[in-house]
Each structure stands twice: as structure tokens, then as C-alpha cells.
């Protein structure tokens, strides 16, 4: 191959490479789409977005959508919102939906809601079509001790002005559950609640539970009310069982004290008997001492012995007569 032919080949390759690099870096197709939609975006501005690491197709497509919907939004605001971490497409869709529904919503407000982590499009849709939140089963006890289990359906509408900083669905569910428990607990009888379930919804709705939340409560409907356990009877049974245990404990304490007192009395009796035996053992010693010292004579001692023997004989005879009295009567 000659040198001129090789040069032309290299030149062609370089030109093709430059064209590929140009079309891959410069969004010509996107620029043509914007021009066809009568959206004025300079091609050098798109190159600048590339350099700022902003996908041009996201910004330009969102701008085209906004222009076709009649929204006046600058491309700088869209790019700034993207750089702040927002979802540009969702914000534009929310603005279009709000415009169609007649809701007053500006770009700055929608962008703030989106950056706050809220789904601004869903919020606009909930403003138009309220959402139904079903609470879990809530149990409450009426004043007669009967447990009631209720389930409520809460219809809420999103409040655009309170989305930033307002509480979410969990707060609504918790407040409604608290109101249901309070209403059931204030009822004198569970039959009142069963006969008029709407008394729960009226009472709860009148408390203004949507204060400080991102929603407006439209209605509260009681879906189901079931009768649970007899909590009052169970509490009374538990109280009676506790009193029984306390009475048994006190009785056991008194029995233990009586047993201890009996043991003490037995020990005291044994001590007294020991003293009597000890005193009886001192009598012969005292007699012997008296005989030695001459305070008592031998005749007196013998007379005392005879007296003791007579006394013992009479006691023996008296005991025998008492034991054999029926026999003695037969002899007579």
C-alpha cells in the first residue's frame, strides 16, 4: 500500500473516532428532541451538565414534560434539585397532577417535600383520592369488666402544607387506637358499645387526632367489634386467689407459733419436774442433817415414817377402790 493511501486510511479512522467520541459525549439526539419540542436548551449547556456529572436526559426530559404541561420552570432549578439529591421526574409529575387537580403547589414546595423524604406524587394523589388506613385490632375493657376488640378504618387526606415536619401514618394509627381504648373504657357497659359502635368513631373524630400530622382525617369507621374475655371476673378471681394464699400463709404462721409455744411449754414442764426431783432429793439429806444436829429425834423420825407409810397405804387403798368400785357394789 502506498503512503498516500495509508495516510487517507489513518485520517478516516481518526475522523470516525472523533465523531464517535463527539456523539457519545455531546447529546445531539437529546438536543434535537428538545428543539423539536420547542424547548430551548443550548448544546453547550448540555456539555456543561456532562462536566458537572448531571445526566442531561433526566433534566431535559423533565423540562420537556413541564413545558408541554404549561409549567414555567427554569432548567437551573431542575439541575439544582437533582444535585441536591432530589427526584426531578417525580417532582414534575407531582406538579402536573396538582395543576390538573386544582391544587396550589409550586416547585419550591414540591422540591422541599421531595428532599424531606416524602413521596410528593403520592401526597398529591392522596389529596385527590383519600387513602384508607386500617388499624390493627385494638382491645379495650369497659367499666363492667368485659373486653371488647375493635378494628377501625381511617380515611385520611394528605395535607400538602404539613407534609414537611408532619407525623406519618404510624402516629395516626397510634392516636386512633388510643382513642378507641379510651372510648371503650369510659363506657359503663360493653353493651352500650355493641349497640352503638358509631359512638367510638364520633368520640375519636371529635378529638382532633390529625393535629401535627401530615394528614387530615376525613372519617373514622368501626369495621368490627368483638367481645373478648371477662377481664373483671379474671381480676376478681386473681384477687381472691391472692387473698387465699395470704390467709393460708397467716394460718401457717399461727400454727407454727402454736407449735413453738407448745414446745416451749413442754420444755418448761420438764424443767419444773427436774426442780421437783431435785427438791425431793434434798429431803433425805435434810433429815440426815437434822438427825446429826439433834434437831429431830429418832422417835419423831419413826413416827414420820409410819405416817408416810399410812398415807401411802390409804392412797393405795383409795386407788384400788376407785379402780374396782363396780366389783365392790356387786359384793354388797
UniProtKB/Swiss-Prot annotation:
Which Pfam families did the record assign?
Answer: FloA
Q: Name one GO cellular component term.
A: plasma membrane
Q: Does the keyword Transmembrane apply?
A: yes
Presence of keyword Ion transport: no
Q: Where are the transmembrane segments?
A: 6-26, 28-48
InterPro entries, per database record? FloA
Quote the subcellular location field of this record: Cell membrane; Membrane raft
Indicate how the chain sits in the lipid bilayer.
Multi-pass membrane protein
Q: What is its main location?
A: membrane
The alphabetical list of record keywords is: Cell membrane, Membrane, Transmembrane, Transmembrane helix
Superkingdom of the source species? Bacteria
State its role: Found in functional membrane microdomains (FMM) that may be equivalent to eukaryotic membrane rafts. FMMs are highly dynamic and increase in number as cells age. Flotillins are thought to be important factors in membrane fluidity.
Q: How does it assemble?
A: Homooligomerizes.
Q: What's this protein's family per the entry? A: Belongs to the flotillin-like FloA family.
Q: What is this protein called in UniProt?
A: Flotillin-like protein FloA
- Organism equals Symbiobacterium thermophilum (strain DSM 24528 / JCM 14929 / IAM 14863 / T)
Amino acid at each position: 500500500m502506498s503512503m498516500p493511501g495509508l495516510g487517507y486510511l489513518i485520517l478516516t479512522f481518526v475522523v470516525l473516532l472523533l465523531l464517535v467520541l463527539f456523539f457519545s459525549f455531546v447529546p445531539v439526539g437529546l438536543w434535537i428532541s428538545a428543539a423539536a419540542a420547542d424547548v430551548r436548551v443550548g448544546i453547550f449547556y448540555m456539555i456543561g451538565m456532562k462536566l458537572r456529572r448531571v445526566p442531561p436526559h433526566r433534566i431535559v426530559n423533565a423540562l420537556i414534560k413541564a413545558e408541554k404541561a404549561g409549567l414555567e420552570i427554569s432548567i437551573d432549578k431542575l439541575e439544582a434539585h437533582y444535585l441536591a439529591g432530589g427526584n426531578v421526574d417525580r417532582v414534575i409529575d407531582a406538579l402536573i397532577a396538582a395543576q390538573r387537580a386544582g391544587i396550589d403547589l409550586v416547585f419550591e414546595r414540591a422540591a422541599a417535600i421531595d428532599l424531606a423524604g416524602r413521596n410528593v406524587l403520592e401526597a398529591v394523589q392522596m389529596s385527590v383520592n383519600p387513602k384508607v388506613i386500617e388499624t390493627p385490632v385494638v382491645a379495650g375493657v369497659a367499666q363492667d369488666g368485659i373486653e371488647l376488640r375493635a378494628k377501625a378504618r381511617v380515611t385520611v387526606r394528605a395535607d400538602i402544607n404539613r407534609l414537611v415536619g408532619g407525623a406519618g401514618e404510624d402516629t395516626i394509627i397510634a392516636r386512633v387506637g388510643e382513642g378507641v381504648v379510651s372510648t371503650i373504657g369510659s363506657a359503663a357497659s360493653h353493651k352500650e358499645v355493641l349497640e352503638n359502635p358509631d359512638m367510638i368513631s364520633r368520640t375519636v373524630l371529635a378529638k382532633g387526632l390529625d393535629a401535627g400530622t401530615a394528614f387530615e382525617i376525613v372519617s373514622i369507621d368501626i369495621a368490627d367489634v368483638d367481645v373478648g374475655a371477662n377481664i373483671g371476673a379474671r381480676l376478681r378471681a386473681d384477687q381472691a386467689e391472692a387473698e387465699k394464699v395470704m390467709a393460708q400463709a397467716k394460718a401457717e404462721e399461727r400454727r407454727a407459733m402454736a407449735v413453738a409455744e407448745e414446745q416451749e411449754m413442754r420444755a418448761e414442764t420438764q424443767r419444773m419436774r427436774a426442780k421437783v426431783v431435785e427438791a425431793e432429793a434434798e429431803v433425805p439429806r435434810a433429815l440426815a442433817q437434822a438427825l446429826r444436829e439433834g434437831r429431830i429425834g429418832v422417835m419423831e423420825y419413826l413416827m414420820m415414817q409410819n405416817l408416810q407409810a399410812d398415807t401411802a397405804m390409804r392412797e393405795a387403798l383409795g386407788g384400788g377402790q376407785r379402780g374396782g368400785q363396780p366389783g365392790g357394789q356387786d359384793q354388797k
